[in-house]
Amino acid sequence: MDTSVPVISSDYIHSARTEYKLTNDESPITLQFPSTLERTRVRIMGKCMKVDHVVIEYRNQVPFNAQGSVIVTIRDTRLSDEQQDQAQFTFPIGCNVDLHYFSASYFSIDDNVPWQLLYKVEDSNVKNGITFAQIKAKLKLSAAKHSTDIKFKQPTIKILSKDYGPDCVDFWSVGKPKPIRRLIQNEPGTDYDTGPKYRPITVQPGETWATKSTIGRYTSMRYTRPNPIDIDDSSSKQYTSEAEFPLRGLHQLPEASLDPGDSISQTQSMSKKDIESIIEQTVNKCLIAHRGSSHKDL
């Protein structure tokens, strides 16, 4: 992988045009990267690198009536095995094409170069092991002090054979996942646990406050919330206990124990004379009680 082409330039790093044998299994395509000396120079400068542009030149060496599809895949080995594919191209085995891929991510000089180019042939009438094409890869790199957002540019295919058109080729590029916010859940007892001590109670339709109230639940504790409790208490025992939900049976008390009595509109009205009589009796009882306590002190 030695080359005299500097990393920070507008030139491409060319790999040798190499003949490749037909195979149904994924096999690597040679992609020339900067020499160890050149990468060390960029590392000393304290910069990171980015693959700006990859060009894969495919030139077939098959009979006129050869059939089959060539599949070229670009991978980033920094990801898990099932998510490494970044782009993929498919085209007929007899079609001469130039494949263009534009990167959208940076990588560190301290790590191994993460990019891989792979090819395979499917549904072909050409025998396995036969040399079927020459492939040459060109790579353009750039260096930066730090990474920045890169505008996505879709991969393209340039068809060079007159017998083939856009309907004969296809390409795909990986999509960017939707960002998801991860909420912070502190462990109980930490110094930075300054939030409310108890979770707010949310009463859903068909539930009561008594069935949802709990004790001893900290906001920062990670636990699986129990399923909503049935009003008839048919399934609550398998999720809760009396210690966790001490008020869950409150809604089952008889109505008489919760009855505050008749409202003022349901009681008989009292006259002024009745009120004066009640006050007079109360005052007399207080005076008699006071006189009795005074005689005892003497």
UniProtKB/Swiss-Prot annotation:
Family: Belongs to the begomovirus movement protein BC1 family.
A Pfam family assignment: Gemini_BL1
Lineage: Viruses, Monodnaviria, Shotokuvirae, Cressdnaviricota, Repensiviricetes
Source superkingdom: Viruses
The protein's name: Movement protein BC1
Main localization category: host cell
Membrane topology, record value: Peripheral membrane protein
Annotated keywords: DNA-binding, Host cell membrane, Host endoplasmic reticulum, Host membrane, Host microsome, Membrane, Phosphoprotein, Transport, Viral movement protein
Assembly and binders: Binds to dimeric supercoiled plasmid DNA.
